[in-house]
């Protein structure tokens, strides 16, 4: 035994070959946390003194090779100064460099995901052999940072500038064959053959059959490209990256490129200093704080879903009531994840529409080479369309997805309850109607919950699981388990008008309506909010949702929260609806829609909209700068999010933030409404509320904000 730790062990195998194995005790995955970094430095000390080691393989005892750095430690680490972060990273890099410089060949045996620091660990080895089931990559830019353990330095020298820039800037992991084509690994083998293949490579290095020293030397010197070739590689990468992401919103890819441009002509040690300085700069951006926080919130939401699922009943078969686009989308989602599902409607043409929707979505996967025609047929066979309830006797859960009308829903739910087994869960896919109210029609209200999918079902990851007054924990657990089984991210919320997402969204639309009444141009508001980071502004969003849906939702919200969601004027959204402008669904809303060459609706300006809006605009039009537009819309949005926490509609800031990002597209780089308030500062946010309080209750600071500001608290504890 060369080294024995609770994160890493080094044992001798045969012929002077050592096995350095990552094996974090009591952990599901290996990661570079403080203790692992400490032990890795100790391993290097031991190996520098181990005269009997002629070669070494790097392995993992887990299903994952190394998942990367311990993201939970970033929160505290990134609170340090830029200089302190740089020194921290350089100190870790010292062990990586010394490991690379050991006087014998090293081969990484990549059995599972080698991401971030895990990929960087493999790059300090001379050779890399990979299981054909593994993945490898440098996803750090998705956290608002970039590789800091030598990843930008070694990748450019191993796979070339252009390939390294694409790998780092996109953050997308590579499958084994793609990694082999890039030169990121030297061989791929079946998982069972991995260790033998790694040992064989080491033996070839020891015997001189492979020139491992030359492989190492390439990583220690500048990149071997002339200035023109370098300029072409960087210009191409910048064009690709900046077309995909605004560097003002997501600066990490641009900062990574800048660091690489500085260090490509430097030897390793100097290059790593440049990388460390760039990493520290990225780590101090608000985007890094938000995206690291978002990663941790995502982990918490998934952990909570697992906890909620503990009391779940087994789900062997589901059913959906109501076909069409929504029912077809739900059926597709279940079937594509291996769950048999019955799709019932009272009209055969609706069943055809639902099956057509599922078939269309699966057909696209076949066209993209992600599914075989045989697999498509197998998936479609899991969906059983029917006009009657004959097959419902053994169904474990029924999702009601009929028209958004409380009387229709109550009648359908009451009918199906009498035809299913006593422990069958009933779930309503409603976006606004009270679950407690719908439950009044049922004999077994404890078996009834809300299950709000977002449209389009196959794209939107969020599912709100709504607890009514009488919903049992088993019913909630089973519905959460179903959502997870369908590949969705469930967030459990308590019942109220609009639940969580729509309750927060409608004050945002209300703030938008008020801006238009006072003279703002809807197209300009859209541009401002898109620049802020939304995928679409409020006018375009309501066109996509449908103005009829928007007006119906606004009526429900006005009845539920009249003090702040019932305007005393007719707004632009209601006016356009009355003039039969429904948005994309009938080609005219705030914008006019024309089909592009791909058959997708493209928005264009429409003078008729401006003529109509003149009738609702105040005679004395006001002008608004961009910041005022942002402040007014985001105050209404964020205040209602906080009120949902106050009212215990949602349990944690993490769940609230994740729901708003997944459900309505809140800018991820801003971390969600709660983190947005944190970054603004509670005192500053409170002052902004007071500045606009004269506009109405929606702009007044919730008591929770006042209490937190007085106590010096934040939504996310600072380390």
Swiss-Prot record:
One of its GO terms (biological process) is fatty acid beta-oxidation. Its EC number is 4.2.1.17, 5.1.2.3, 5.3.3.8, 1.1.1.35. The active site is at 452 (for 3-hydroxyacyl-coa dehydrogenase activity). Residues 1-190 are annotated as: Enoyl-CoA hydratase/isomerase. SUPFAM superfamilies: 6-phosphogluconate dehydrogenase C-terminal domain-like, ClpP/crotonase, NAD(P)-binding Rossmann-fold domains. It catalyses: a (3S)-3-hydroxyacyl-CoA + NAD(+) = a 3-oxoacyl-CoA + NADH + H(+); a (3S)-3-hydroxyacyl-CoA = a (2E)-enoyl-CoA + H2O; a 4-saturated-(3S)-3-hydroxyacyl-CoA = a (3E)-enoyl-CoA + H2O; (3S)-3-hydroxybutanoyl-CoA = (3R)-3-hydroxybutanoyl-CoA. It holds the Pfam family 3HCDH. NAD(+) binds at residues 326, 345, 402-404, 409, 431, 455. GO terms for cellular component: fatty acid beta-oxidation multienzyme complex. Residues 313-719 are annotated as: 3-hydroxyacyl-CoA dehydrogenase. One of its GO terms (molecular function) is enoyl-CoA hydratase activity. Keywords: Fatty acid metabolism, Isomerase, Lipid degradation, Lipid metabolism, Lyase, Multifunctional enzyme, NAD, Oxidoreductase. Pathway: Lipid metabolism; fatty acid beta-oxidation. Coiled coil: none annotated. InterPro entries: 3-OHacyl-CoA_DH_CS (IPR006180), 3-OHacyl-CoA_DH_NAD-bd (IPR006176), 3HC_DH_C (IPR006108), 6-PGluconate_DH-like_C_sf (IPR008927), ClpP/crotonase-like_dom_sf (IPR029045), Enoyl-CoA_hydra/iso (IPR001753), FA_oxidation_alpha_subunit (IPR050136), FadB (IPR012799). In the N-terminal section; belongs to the enoyl-CoA hydratase/isomerase family. In the C-terminal section; belongs to the 3-hydroxyacyl-CoA dehydrogenase family. NCBIfam families: FadB (TIGR02437), PRK11730.1 (NF008727). Involved in the aerobic and anaerobic degradation of long-chain fatty acids via beta-oxidation cycle. Catalyzes the formation of 3-oxoacyl-CoA from enoyl-CoA via L-3-hydroxyacyl-CoA. It can also use D-3-hydroxyacyl-CoA and cis-3-enoyl-CoA as substrate. This is Fatty acid oxidation complex subunit alpha. It comes from Psychrobacter arcticus (strain DSM 17307 / VKM B-2377 / 273-4). The gene is fadB.
